[in-house]
Every structure is written in structure tokens, then in C-alpha cells.
A protein has these predicted regions:
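Catalytic machinery of carbohydrate-active enzymes
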Residues: 1-337
């Protein structure tokens, strides 16, 4: 891109799911500034993915020490890449700035428009709308059109290759199962997963488990279920994870960033919820269904942590398969029961 191109900068320090929930808002900004280069300051993994999908033009890892001065209010022009702030017309940041220090620092660079807002809120029916509220009245755009992530062909091929390495070719419909979440208090029991995996096989589906670096406990628990020849993949990056998910004809998971990723890729998705509010946090789309146990009666997250019953997570496996079968896939049905 030309060195003189004007830029807009988006700052999002949240995790995978939080960043993915904000891409509708990014699309509104893109529509309002079609000639600008969009730069995202976020986690390196999700930033790389969104760059591959064309949601943004460039990403910079928010973990970088080079950017720490910006958030501490000590940034100097020599500390940041020239094209990050020198030709910037807009900064939108989803972060807290209680003392106004970050705003003042950005304005000292001569940026004409700075919009900063914490994503935390109890208002609004869905978290994606919280990000859109940041832009309310600022830019025109259709905030209701659901987005999909589209991976380039070489990335898709890497997912096919990863499955082939563990002996999975195109054949039975592939169901990706993600056993983890950002909190163990949002995960169903291992024996529920055991029943789900056995149920996939009984329905002539091919279950594949994907695990992240924080899912060691989930891995030990599922291995204790005595499931023979269970395919397990540990993608080395979020982009590789997306490449694998994109091969699937169905996905089962918890309230997690991976579940949002599957849904954004257009994969028929069943999300198992418990203590969190699906009206606020579930992925959206006709290809998404939510199942849960009983309504959670815990008053706050401390009560959730202390709860041993977790009746809200007592999901019935047959309801998962009914949901998977009932989803309007738009491509094809994955169950034959």
C-alpha cells in the first residue's frame, strides 16, 4: 500500500472471542473509511488471522514492549512505527481509560478523532452490539449484516493437510469438538463429552477433538473416558485452528472464543452454555444453536466458582444432536438419523 495512505487504528486487548465479537464494528469502520488502511492492535494470533481473512490490513501485537509506552502515556514519536499514528485519522479503542491518559497521549500525536470505551457493560442484548455502540452516531453503515470469515486457499489447504496427517480424509461428515473454554466453570463434564463422541460415531459422523495450550485438564479428563482411537489435534496457531474448523460439517463446543470462530467460519455450530448468558454471549446465525442444562441460579461469578452441582451444565447429549440436525446448514445436513 502507498506509504502516504491514511490510516485508522483499532485497539482491542481482549481475548479471541472478544475480538471476534467486534468484527461487525470493524466492518462499519471499513465502510466509512474505504480508502484508509486499517491497523489492529490486538493479540498477535487473532490479529494474524483477521489479516489473513482481509478484515484488517495490518496487525501489531499488543503484547509488544514497543507499544507499552503508548498505554502508559509515555509514547514518543520515535517509539512507534511511522504509519501507525503519524497519518492516522481515527483511533477506536475498546479499553478502559479512566484517567484519560491514553486519550491525551493519542491526541498529542495530532489524531483528530479518538474514541475509547470499555467493552464491559451490562447494557445491550448482545456483546457485539456493545462494540457497535462505541460507533453509534459516528458512521453510517449496516450494523446488522452478519459477517463471515473467509480463509485464503493456502490456509484452507493447511487444514486439509493437518487432518490427513492423523488419517482423516474426506469421507464421513467431520464434527470438530472443542473441550475447553476460558474457564473450567463453563465446561460440561468429561462423561458428557464421552457420550457425545460415542454418539457421533453411532451416527456415522467423524469426531475430532481440538485442544489448546490451556486445555490440559480437559485432555486428561477425556482420555479417562476410555474412547478408542480418539483423534486429537493441537493446532499450533489460531489460523491453523481456523483452517481445521473450516473443513468441518459440524462443531460442538462451550462458551468460548473457538466456538465464535467456528460460527464465523460458517460451520454449523452447537454451543453448550451454562452459567453465562447466551442472549449476550452466544454466536449469532441460523447455523448456530445453543443448548444448556437448567437455568443458572448463581448470583455472581464467585457463586459460580463455589457451585459444585453445576446443574446449568448438565446438557443432554440427545439435545445436542437434535440441535445439530435441526440447524439450517444451508450446505447440507450432517446427521443421517
Amino acid at each position: 500500500m502507498p506509504g502516504s495512505q491514511r490510516t485508522i487504528v483499532v485497539i482491542h486487548p481482549g481475548g479471541l472471542g472478544d475480538v471476534l465479537l467486534s468484527i461487525d464494528a470493524m466492518a462499519v469502520m471499513r465502510s466509512a473509511f474505504p480508502q484508509h488502511k486499517m491497523i489492529l492492535l490486538a493479540g498477535s494470533e487473532v490479529g494474524h488471522l483477521l489479516g489473513q481473512c482481509g478484515v484488517i490490513d495490518q496487525s501489531l501485537p499488543i503484547e509488544s514492549s514497543r507499544l507499552s509506552a503508548l498505554f502508559s502515556g509515555r509514547a514518543q514519536r520515535s517509539d512507534l512505527q511511522q504509519d501507525l499514528l503519524w497519518r492516522c485519522d481515527l483511533v477506536v479503542g475498546w479499553l478502559s481509560d479512566h484517567d484519560g491518559l491514553i486519550r491525551r497521549t493519542l491526541q498529542e500525536f495530532g489524531i483528530p478523532r479518538v474514541i475509547l470505551q470499555s467493552p464491559a457493560s451490562t447494557e445491550g442484548p448482545h456483546q457485539s452490539e456493545r462494540f457497535l455502540q462505541t460507533l453509534q452516531g459516528e458512521f453510517p453503515g449496516d450494523a446488522r449484516a452478519p459477517l463471515r470469515l473467509h480463509l485464503p486457499q493456502q490456509v484452507l489447504q493447511s487444514g486439509t493437510d493437518a487432518l490427513r496427517v492423523i488419517g482423516i480424509e474426506q469421507g464421513a461428515p467431520l464434527i470438530v469438538c472443542h473441550l475447553g473454554s476460558g474457564s473450567r466453570h463453563k465446561c460440561v463434564r468429561a462423561d458428557t463429552w464421552g457420550t457425545l463422541i460415542q454418539g457421533c460415531r453411532a451416527r456415522q459422523l467423524m469426531p475430532v477433538v481440538v485442544l489448546g495450550s490451556a486445555d490440559e485438564q480437559a485432555e486428561m479428563a477425556i482420555r479417562g473416558q476410555g474412547l478408542p482411537e480418539l483423534p486429537i489435534l493441537r493446532p499450533r496457531s489460531v489460523t491453523m485452528l481456523a483452517a481445521i474448523l473450516a473443513q468441518a460439517q459440524g462443531y460442538i463446543g462451550h462458551d468460548s472464543g473457538v466456538t465464535h470462530l467456528a460460527a464465523l467460519l460458517g460451520v454449523p455450530t452447537v454451543a453448550m452454555f451454562g452459567p453465562t448468558d447466551e442472549q449476550r454471549w452466544a454466536p449469532r446465525g441460523v447455523h448456530v444453536a445453543v443448548v444448556r442444562g437448567e437455568n443458572c441460579m448463581c448470583a455472581n461469578w464467585d457463586a459460580v466458582r463455589a457451585c459444585t452441582e453445576k446443574s446449568c451444565l448438565k446438557v443432554k447429549p440427545n439435545e445436542v444432536f437434535e440441535a445439530l440436525d435441526a440447524i439450517d446448514f444451508r450446505y447440507h445436513r450432517v446427521t443421517n438419523s
